[in-house]
Every structure is written in structure tokens, then in C-alpha cells.
Amino acid sequence: MPTVGVVLNDDKPQALEVARRMADWLSQREVPMGIPLTRVAELVHSPSPELRDRLRQLDLIVVLGGDGTLLNTARLAAPHGIPVVGVNLGRLGFLTEVEVSDLFPALERIIAGDYRIEERMMLEARLIRDGLEQPSYFALNDVVVTKGDHPRMIRVEAAVGDEVVWTYSADGLIVSSPTGSTAYSLSAGGPIVSPELHALLLTPISPHALDARPLVIPQDQAVRLTVISSHSHAVVTVDGQPGQPMVCGDSVLVRKASVACRLIRLGERTFFRILREKMQQGR
């Protein structure tokens, strides 16, 4: 029997009730739960050393929530190679695989090993200040340098490898993975990229130039975003988490991560079928 973890977003009205029903279901079938029912906020912001140790021993994680909950969980699961399956309690759910009405039939298949793994490319981001590299972060969707809540645009120099591509005056810049191409980057006018293609996308947010267009960059290249605004109000965010302030001269180096998100898939729905369904649902 696989050892299962359950992570929930208790901001969702159904989440706690569904989690308890699921825990009972697993217990009745003597499926071991490697961690107690865990709120995603605890997992991301204040995990105990014991919780971190037990997380590494899981065979799979079931996520009850929406795409945001799955993103948060995936960043912690990916370094340990733990597969993740999302149960959609949100609205669109591009990444989640199971609707809550189908939860228990889906669990039967998962426990029996009747699923496939879909690997998604992730990003690694590192803030560089005064020439010193700060600890790195993983992202499944995107890394964003933005003006935050300040009304003025920021100036950001974008380099690919050692070559400066452009200096943007804009509300910000998005570096996204193919998975993130249907998130913030899409709303900023970026292209939709199949997750089977490994690449980095550079998308400006409301640029002050008509010729500032999105770029698609090979997976083996790193993107460096350097704040050159004299007024220091830029912020860098990873997968929409609370941001870290940046000052003039700070850089963020973004590259393809050495780890990947492993998503559990049950059906044969293609990326483009999911895209059609979710786009129509979001109208």
C-alpha cells in the first residue's frame, strides 16, 4: 500500500469535510497516512521539522483545493520526487485532475497504481543582491518582477545568458514555465505553450512600448532580470506568494530547475482538450 499525505486549503468551504471523509475512507482500507491532515498554510509557511521529515517518506500527496493549493504543495514535493494529484475545490482547476464528485472512484485507481505520471518543468529563481546570491526558490508557474502596489512603472533590464535583450519600462516582467503560460502570462498577452515543450517565456506586463513582445527562450538558457529604476519599489514573487522587495541593482536569475513536478493523471484528456474545457468554463 502506498503511504498517502492529504493537504487541504481550509479557505475552501468543502475542504475540511472532504478531507475527513477521505481520511475515514483510507483508514477503512488500511491505507497508511504518512502525515496528519495538513493545511497548506502550515505546510508552506510554518512546517515543523517532524512534518518535513514525514513529508519525505510519502509515496503520493492528494491536494484538496484549487490550482493555488496544488502549486504550493508541488514546490515542496518536487525536490523529493513525490507525485501529486489535485482534487478541484476551486473554480477552473487547470492543474487539478479529479472533481470532488469523482474522488473515491479516483482514489480506488490511485491506490491500485492505475495511473500515469506527467512531469512538468519547473523554474528555479535566485535573488542576487550586491553580487551575493540568496537562497533559491522553485516555481511551477512563474517568477514575476513587478511594481507592486506603487503607481509608477519600473525599469527592468532583461538578459538571456550574457546578452542583454531589452530594457523594459513596464508594470513588470513575467518569466513563466510552459505550465505557467496559461496563468498570469496569458492575461498579460503571452502565448499558450504546451507543457510538453520545455522553454522559458518572458512576458512584459503593460509595457510602455508597442514593440515590447513576449519571448520564448530555450530551456538551457537562464534569464536575468535586473531592476534599474532609481525609485526602489519593485517586488519579486514566486507562484503568486508574498513578494520580496527589490532595490535598484538587484537581479533575479531564473533558469530551468533540476527538479520537476510529478502530476498523477488518470484520464486520457490532452492538454488541448483541458484548455478548451477550462477556457469555455471561464467565460
Curated annotation (Swiss-Prot):
Its EC number is 2.7.1.23. Its cofactor is a divalent metal cation. It is an enzyme of class 2 (transferase). One of its GO terms (molecular function) is ATP binding. It is found in: Cytoplasm. InterPro entries: ATP-NAD_kinase_N, ATP-NAD_kinase_PpnK-typ_C, NAD/diacylglycerol_kinase_sf, NADK. The keyword NADP applies. The gene is nadK. Disulfide bonds: none annotated. NAD(+) binds at D67, G68, N141, D142, R152, D171, T182, A183, Y184, S185, L186, S187, Q241. SUPFAM superfamilies: NAD kinase/diacylglycerol kinase-like. The lineage of its organism: Bacteria, Bacillati, Bacillota, Clostridia, Eubacteriales. The active site is at D67 (proton acceptor). Involved in the regulation of the intracellular balance of NAD and NADP, and is a key enzyme in the biosynthesis of NADP. Catalyzes specifically the phosphorylation on 2'-hydroxyl of the adenosine moiety of NAD to yield NADP. This is NAD kinase. Pfam families: NAD_kinase, NAD_kinase_C. It catalyses: NAD(+) + ATP = ADP + NADP(+) + H(+). PANTHER family: NAD KINASE. GO terms for biological process: NAD metabolic process; NADP biosynthetic process. Keywords: ATP-binding, Cytoplasm, Kinase, NAD, NADP, Nucleotide-binding, Transferase. GO terms for cellular component: cytoplasm. Belongs to the NAD kinase family.
